């Protein structure tokens, strides 16, 4: 089940390319694997809940968990928070 590209996944890929170019391919693959696993785990959710899970919640979790491979937890959290803040402006 391939997820539609969201602002979170787009911003994650941009961060990976700009800040971790040598690891970007592996980070993108790890992000995609984690996101697909999260989507599969939540496949039974209601249609209304699915929308929010697919567009924001699960991509945010996947980005946060994947970024922790290359940065401290707090920095990963602030990075993902920055994606949301940027969209809100």
What are the language-model segments listed below?
Residues 15, 19, 48-55:
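A structural signal for alpha-helical segments
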Residues 5-44:
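N-terminal acidic leader/helix
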Residues 82-89:
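Long, amphipathic, charge-rich alpha-helical segments that form helical bundles/coiled-coils
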Residues 1-2:
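Small-residue-biased structural context
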Residues 25, 29-32, 36, 54, ...:
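Generic structural signal for well-ordered, non-transmembrane alpha-helical segments
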Residues 34, 41, 45-48, 67-70, ...:
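Hydrophobic stripe of amphipathic alpha-helices that form coiled-coil interfaces
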Residues 51-82:
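Short, charge-rich amphipathic interface segments used for partner binding and complex assembly
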């Amino acid at each position: 089940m391939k997820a539609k590209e969201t602002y979170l996944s787009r911003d994650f890929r941009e961060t990976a390319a700009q800040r971790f170019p040598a690891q970007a391919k592996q980070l993108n693959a790890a992000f995609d694997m984690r996101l697909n696993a999260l989507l599969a785990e939540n496949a039974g959710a209601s249609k209304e809940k699915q929308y929010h899970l697919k567009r924001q919640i699960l991509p945010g979790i996947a980005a946060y968990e994947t970024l922790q491979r290359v940065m401290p937890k707090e920095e990963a959290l602030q990075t993902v928070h920055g994606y949301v803040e940027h969209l809100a402006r």
